[in-house]
Amino acid sequence: MYKFALIGCDIGYTSSPVVHEAVSGELGIDISFEVCDIGASGLEAAVTKLFDTVDGIFVTKPYKNDIKRYLDKVNTRSGVNVVRCADKSGFNTDGIGFLYALDRAFDDWRSKVRGVLVLGSGGAARSVAEALADTGKSVYVLNRDMVTAAKMCRAFGIEQYYNQPAELIVNCTSAGSDGEDILKALCVSPEFEYAYDLIYYADTPFMQRTAAAGAKVSDGKAMLVYQAIEGEKLLTGVKADTLDVFERAFAKLDGKF
């Protein structure tokens, strides 16, 4: 049996246990899955303990960048969302999971989209921005903290947003889960052709307003499943077709998150 844990702060909403149960079943492996909801002051102690007690750690907000200081090797420029405890190595499966999800939600986006606006500059935003930049799209970043946005732009060779043309908008912030309108907060028009919200557990104002303005929209459920599949494959060495595993696991999860 493989032992996994999820580490984050204020994550009582998480559907990760049920998602990983479905994914592991389709991969043919037995797992246990522990949720560690901890404050920043307890991060080091929690990570140190988990290194000795589990095989892999899945990392969520707000620790995808902070986790790096406890690792011996980091295999990504983006935020770390998967840690292999045996050698204290960090990886990112958010980026590939996001692209899988985007392809599933909008089958024509690769030919129709030239510019993308990414909201946020945390670990998830960095993963999304890097993945999009690697596809050759023009990526623009908008965040309340201009300093962190500027650092992110320098890291990935992308630009801060000053109303450049963009067909796709991606919300990588947690704003909206509590009813906050991130578009209003950042003074952004909702008029885009495509809108993707990484939030999967709430019908956000971001989703509502972009849909009302005519956009094709999607929430983050598929991305959560895709990144979990890639993470479990990485940690266990199991070889499997991600798209095939996704369809079976996602069908199992219908209505559960």
Q: What do the PLM-derived regions correspond to, one by one?
A:
Residues R154-S218:
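Rossmann-like adenosine-cofactor binding region
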Residues M1, K112-G115, F192:
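Phosphate-coordination loops involved in phosphoryl transfer and adenosine-cofactor binding
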Residues Y194-R248:
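Rossmann-fold NAD(P)-binding glycine/threonine-rich loop
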Residues G8, G90-G95, L102, W109-G136, ...:
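Glycine-rich adenosine-cofactor-binding loop
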Residues D134-S138, A213-K216:
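Conserved S-adenosyl-L-methionine
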Residues D66-I67, D145-K151, A202-F206:
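Short, charged/polar "capping" segments at the starts of alpha-helices
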Residues M1-D108, A202:
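Phosphate/diphosphate ligand-binding glycine-rich loop within oxidoreductases
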